[in-house]
């Protein structure tokens, strides 16, 4: 592991000339996609592509679309020419992919089978896999969290290739900078391992989630109305199960600890909202795992986790999804200016590529890792929230310690309150375009490059600047009796916090608290993990997670995004 004293020297930011050279080949778009007012380009494109099903000839009822259903070819008759109207209807989403593929097979007089298969590569977990076999040729495998979704994805993959709808990727010049920034908003491809098909009504369902978050937070602060001032930065994790949504973790905050290093693990280093919410989510996971390991059938049934036949690790039960709501865009690359364009003769090309690089948070302010103040090497710094989101979309949100017990847990949907942004372009690029799907094949078993659905929703709370509460952070997880308030400057609980852990004033989200829960869970699970002498050792013993983390860091550096900062190892050399 690299020393913390050298991280700022190892980052490489491409020169302005390289940035301009890299973006010269970018060609103007040949088509313009017009979206309705109030919808992001992706939301509109996906809903049009996958949600509308009209009554057209050859549209098969869903119960008949089993894995054994096939279109019978007629070798005597010549194939029909594919009408342009058919292609346009499919591209507009007026025919769903499965129906469209069957119609294509009928017109071309070819045999079609939609067969259930196994997941490709090293992708394991609660995913169904289908592939289309057209005239004896097998096309790419489509995955989904249910059979309907995986069939649709498989049909779309086959049709896009048969109709030659896939446009070639623009050639990337080999420079040290990140990939070119798209000149105009585009409908991003969702042909990834875990693609999310946007069905009719999904946008309305997402809009309701922000209201659910608001109602839950209002309940938590019903007796302390002054806490409403924390709401501007609020982030929350929501469990979706059988169409029902439940808020399970909440965090607020816009600051991070940047003082001297404390080796006891009892200081909370990053109190930005989404980071605080994610650490609260970990506490929720620990409680759910204790339910499972209780061996009480009734309690095990309540747990969101279950056994995985192909592994000794637990996994989320089927039809359980995790959604993230953020009242505002996370700091870092997600806040890239929507108006930036790639005109190589303007400064915006440099700005766009620079903003896509990795960022570090120092006392709530954001810097490129290479430009971070030099005195930061003697203090604790954290990667930006945008960069941490990018990391979670590859490694999962569960972290190293919980990876001893469960498979990676990925976010299904990310919802952004529309109070301070009109589109999700920056977040789409930061999460979906900085890391290529090809990285999945290089990752350990169960890890993949996740592609969450991203959408704008009505803000749960208005954005407001309140200097009095600038440094304070609030956290809560399902099962907590009360809220906890942490001072981001000191990384400790405030005197006025409804919840206090004891004389040390350590937060229930700190590293020491997580290690304590880890030891308890290891005992309940009867796993020989207690031999780890320190927090750092327990993390390092999670071999697959550490391998995936190293591959992600190498990928980001090799593609010109900069180096992931490495904190001093002494902050993790503690035990209980």
UniProtKB/Swiss-Prot annotation:
Required for male fertility and normal male germ cell differentiation. Plays a role in spermatogenesis. Binds to RNA but not to DNA. Its main location: nucleus. One of its GO terms (molecular function) is double-stranded RNA binding. The keyword Protein transport does not apply. The gene is ADAD1. GO terms for biological process: adenosine to inosine editing; RNA processing; spermatid development. InterPro entries: A_deamin, ADAD1_DSRM, dsRBD_dom. GO terms for cellular component: cytoplasm; male germ cell nucleus; nucleolus. Gene3D superfamilies: 3.30.160.20. SMART domains: ADEAMc, DSRM. Residues 249-574 form the A to I editase domain. Pfam families: A_deamin, dsrm. It comes from Homo sapiens. This is Adenosine deaminase domain-containing protein 1. It is found in: Nucleus. Keywords: Developmental protein, Differentiation, Nucleus, RNA-binding, Spermatogenesis.
């Amino acid at each position: 592991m690299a020393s913390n004293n050298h991280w700022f020297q190892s980052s490489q930011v491409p020169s302005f000339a390289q940035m301009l050279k890299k973006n010269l080949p970018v060609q103007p778009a040949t088509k313009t996609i017009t979206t309705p007012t109030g919808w992001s380009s992706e939301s509109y494109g996906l809903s049009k592509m996958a949600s509308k099903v009209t009554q057209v000839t050859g549209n098969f009822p869903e119960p008949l679309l089993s894995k054994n259903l096939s279109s019978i070819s007629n070798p005597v008759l010549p194939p029909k020419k594919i009408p342009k109207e058919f292609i346009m209807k499919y591209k507009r989403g007026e025919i769903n992919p499965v129906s469209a593929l069957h119609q294509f097979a009928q017109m071309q007089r070819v045999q079609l089978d939609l067969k259930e298969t196994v997941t490709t590569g090293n992708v394991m977990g609660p995913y169904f896999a289908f592939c289309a076999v057209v005239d004896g040729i097998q096309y790419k495998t489509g995955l989904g969290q249910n059979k309907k979704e995986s069939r649709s994805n498989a049909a779309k993959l086959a049709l896009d290739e048969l109709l030659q709808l896939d446009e070639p990727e623009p050639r990337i010049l080999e420079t040290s900078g990140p990939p070119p920034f798209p000149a105009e908003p585009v409908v991003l491809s969702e042909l990834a391992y875990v693609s999310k098909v946007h069905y009719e009504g999904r946008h309305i369902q997402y809009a309701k989630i922000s209201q659910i978050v608001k109602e839950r937070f209002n309940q938590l602060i019903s007796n302390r109305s002054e806490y409403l001032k924390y709401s501007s930065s609020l982030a929350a994790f929501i469990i979706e199960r059988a169409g029902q949504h439940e808020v399970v973790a909440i965090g607020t905050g816009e600051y991070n600890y940047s003082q001297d290093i404390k080796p006891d693990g009892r200081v909370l280093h990053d109190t930005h909202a989404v980071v605080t919410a994610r650490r609260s989510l970990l506490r929720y996971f620990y409680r759910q795992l204790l339910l499972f390991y209780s061996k009480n059938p009734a309690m095990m049934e309540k747990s969101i986790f279950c056994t995985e036949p192909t592994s000794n690790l637990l996994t989320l039960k089927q039809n359980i999804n995790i959604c993230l709501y953020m009242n505002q865009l996370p700091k870092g690359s997600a806040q890239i200016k929507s108006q930036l364009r790639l005109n190589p003769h303007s400064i915006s090309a440099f700005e766009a590529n620079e903003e896509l690089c990795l960022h570090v948070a120092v006392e709530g302010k954001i810097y490129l890792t290479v430009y971070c103040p030099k005195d930061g090497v003697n203090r604790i710094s954290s990667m930006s929230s945008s960069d941490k989101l990018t990391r979670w979309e590859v490694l999962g949100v569960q972290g190293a310690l919980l990876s001893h017990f469960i498979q990676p847990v990925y976010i299904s949907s990310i919802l952004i309150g529309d109070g301070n942004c009109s589109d999700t372009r920056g977040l789409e690029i930061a999460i979906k375009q900085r890391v290529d799907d090809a990285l999945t094949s290089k990752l350990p078993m169960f890890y993949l490059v996740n592609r969450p659905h991203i959408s704008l929703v009505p803000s749960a709370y208005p954005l407001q600047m309140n200097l009095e509460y600038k440094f304070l952070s609030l956290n809560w997880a399902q099962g907590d009796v009360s809220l906890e308030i942490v001072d981001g400057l000191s990384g400790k609980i405030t005197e006025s916090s409804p919840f206090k852990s004891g004389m040390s004033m350590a937060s229930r989200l700190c590293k020491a608290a997580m290690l304590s829960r880890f030891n308890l869970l290891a005992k309940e699970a009867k796993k020989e993990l207690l031999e780890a002498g320190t927090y750092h050792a327990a993390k390092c013993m999670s071999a697959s997670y550490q391998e995936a983390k190293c591959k992600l860091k190498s990928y980001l550096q090799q593609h010109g995004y900069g180096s992931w900062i490495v904190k001093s190892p002494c902050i993790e050399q503690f035990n209980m």
